[in-house]
Regions:
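A conditional alpha-helix N-cap/helix-loop micro-motif detector
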Residues: 30-35, 58-61, 110
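Short, small-residue-biased leader/transition segments that mark boundaries at the very start
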Residues: 1-6
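Primarily the HKD phosphodiesterase
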Residues: 38-105
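Short beta-strand scaffold segments in enzyme catalytic cores
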Residues: 119-122, 146
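Amphipathic alpha-helical interface segments
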Residues: 134, 141-175
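General small-molecule cofactor/ligand-binding pocket signal
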Residues: 79, 108-113
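Acidic/glycine-enriched edge-of-secondary-structure segments
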Residues: 13-32, 52-55
Length: 175
């Protein structure tokens, strides 16, 4: 239900933002064409980056660590939300544990979850990427992700991910 609420709000943001340049502000990307814009958003971050990706891959993790090293040194906080190493259901838990440890050593804050992990990124509490792409795992061409500028949606994702999960989430897209 919470995911439907976020998708509804993002859909509202997409349709209400038609006056702006859709390709720059609000857009839907496929698994084959989001990376360049996503990486630019990451490199434009000034305060913080939160990436929630249930699945992770060594290639994407080490690419992210390398790409964001200077950002981190400049004070940008990076948080990764992902499954516990033994919750992946495939592969070697020791390998996932090592990836988590390498991200920690690189200065990333790691929040692990056991049951549900959404797929999104929030940059500077305003730029939101939300969809079914695992941002830290292998891309699938048929997956998609939406990019919107919305402090409200960013706030809701933060509340769902880090806040009181028992609190009812408002789903009124006309706020």
């Amino acid at each position: 239900q919470r995911q439907m609420c976020i998708r509804d709000r993002i859909g509202y943001e997409l349709s209400s933002g038609l006056k702006a340049d859709k390709q720059i502000v609000n857009a839907i990307y496929g698994g084959d064409n989001y990376r360049e814009t996503f990486h630019k958003d990451l490199l434009d971050a000034n305060k913080n980056i939160i990436i929630s990706s249930p699945a992770i891959s060594g290639q994407k993790v080490y690419e992210l660590i390398s790409m964001l090293k200077e950002k981190q040194e400049a004070g940008v906080q990076i948080t990764i939300v992902t499954w516990m190493p033994d919750s992946y259901g495939f592969g070697d838990a020791a390998y996932w544990m090592q990836l988590h440890e390498d991200m920690r050593k690189a200065g990333f804050y790691i929040k692990t979850v056991e049951e549900y992990c959404d797929r999104f990124a929030v940059i500077d509490q305003e730029v939101v990427w939300y969809g079914n792409i695992n941002l830290l795992a292998k891309d699938k061409i048929d997956n998609s992700i939406m990019r919107v500028m919305s402090k409200d949606i960013a706030g809701e994702l933060m509340e769902i991910t880090f806040g009181d999960n028992d609190r009812e989430v408002r789903c009124n897209v006309n706020d």
